[in-house]
């Protein structure tokens, strides 16, 4: 994507939009919670947001997720 969002970051973003916690996302993707926090941090920079809800709203506005 033009924003440089990786496939894994997109997967994390979709799970955030479904209301999953960092721990739940980590368990779903079989990675550590620390890894998820890193992906979320990267997403915040790429989407220019500060909160999870803002990330989901921005991603929907930009048609990154449905």
Protein language model features and the residues they cover:
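Regulatory hinge/linker segments at domain boundaries
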Residues: 1-15
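Exposed, low-complexity/repetitive linear segments and helix-based recognition motifs
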Residues: 6-8, 30, 58
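Recognition helix of helix-turn-helix DNA-binding domains
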Residues: 19-54, 61
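…primarily DNA-binding HTH/wHTH and HhH modules…
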Residues: 65-66
């Amino acid at each position: 994507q033009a924003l440089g969002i990786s496939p894994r970051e997109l997967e994390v973003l979709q799970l955030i939009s479904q209301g999953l916690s960092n721990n739940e996302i980590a368990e779903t993707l079989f990675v550590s919670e620390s890894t998820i926090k890193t992906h979320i941090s990267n997403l915040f920079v790429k989407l220019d947001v500060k909160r999870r809800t803002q990330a989901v709203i921005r991603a929907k506005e930009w048609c990154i997720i449905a």
